Structure formats: C-alpha cells, structure tokens
Amino acid sequence: MEPEVEVYALGQHICMSAHKARRVIDQIRGRPYDEILMILELMPYRACYPIFKLVYSAAANATNNKGFNKTALIISQAEVNEGTVVKKLKPRARGRSYPIKRPTCHITIVLQDISKDKNFYIWLRKKGGWIYKEKYIDIREKYEYFLHEALNRGRMEWANSGYEVVWDKK
C-alpha cells in the first residue's frame, strides 16, 4: 500500500469570476511550491491573493498534518468551478432598481509530495520543447547548483552549502 502523497485546500464562495481566477491558476499548475509563491506575489491580478492564501494553507496542511517537506511539494491539481451568483438590487432614480450580479467561484488546490511518490515523473521544458525526465531533481539542489556555478565563475567561496532555502510569507 502506497503512502498518501496528496493534500488539498478548498476555498468556496470567493467573490470573483471563475474566468479571472482560471487565468491565474493556469500559470501555476504543475509548478513547485517555492516558485508558486514568488509568481503569485509578483502577478498584478486581484485573483492572486485568495489563491496565494489557499496554496499557503495547503502547504501548512501538508507540513502539520502529514509531515511533508515544503521543498518537495508541487501542485498536482488546481481547478476553479463556478459558484452561486449573489444577487443584489441597486436603487435608481424614480423608485426603480437595477439588479447587480456578483459571481463567486470555488477553488481547489491539491499539492503532491514528490519525494514520497515512487511513480512520479517530471516533464521539463527546454528550448526545443518538452522533454521527459525520469528522475526528480530537487528544487533546492538546482538552486544550490546554480549559486555554486555562479559564484565559482566569479572566483568566490560559497559557505552555506547545506542551507535550506524555502521562501515562506505569512
């Protein structure tokens, strides 16, 4: 029996159009947790903040409830469904009123721990297109390798080789 490798967070009745939320969700689907937080922090859309809170909540569920490492989390599923429409009446001239429709949406974020999943394979994007990679490379390892290469080209020493880099914003 395989261990559970997924954890989720669900946001219901978020006051925004499902179309606007999907625009942001499509940008973060399949990416690692660290990269998602940076992308959502820098995107200029109003939908980013509720999605940021959901991703952060799902990661907190993963670490507290399941004991997963945040550096090995990716978004395996992210979906946006239409919710109910909140209807209000706006008073107008001569005793009339116009209806106002406020759409809502339901957002589901599912995070997967890659280090615990034996059957996980990752697709990497290269200049020529997508290539299939059978072995998962930890994001932290890629980051450390990049820093090591950049600093060695400049003939500098890098002392913090064992430091774990996780960007966490509350």
From Swiss-Prot:
Signal peptide: none annotated. Pfam families: Ribosomal_L22. One of its GO terms (cellular component) is large ribosomal subunit. One of its GO terms (molecular function) is structural constituent of ribosome. It is found in: Plastid, Chloroplast. Its main location: plastid. Keywords: Chloroplast, Plastid, Ribonucleoprotein, Ribosomal protein, RNA-binding, rRNA-binding. One of its GO terms (biological process) is translation. Gene3D superfamilies: Ribosomal protein L22/L17. Belongs to the universal ribosomal protein uL22 family. This protein binds specifically to 23S rRNA. The globular domain of the protein is located near the polypeptide exit tunnel on the outside of the subunit, while an extended beta-hairpin is found that lines the wall of the exit tunnel in the center of the 70S ribosome. Part of the 50S ribosomal subunit. This is Large ribosomal subunit protein uL22c. It comes from Nandina domestica (Heavenly bamboo). The lineage of its organism: Eukaryota, Viridiplantae, Streptophyta, Embryophyta, Tracheophyta.
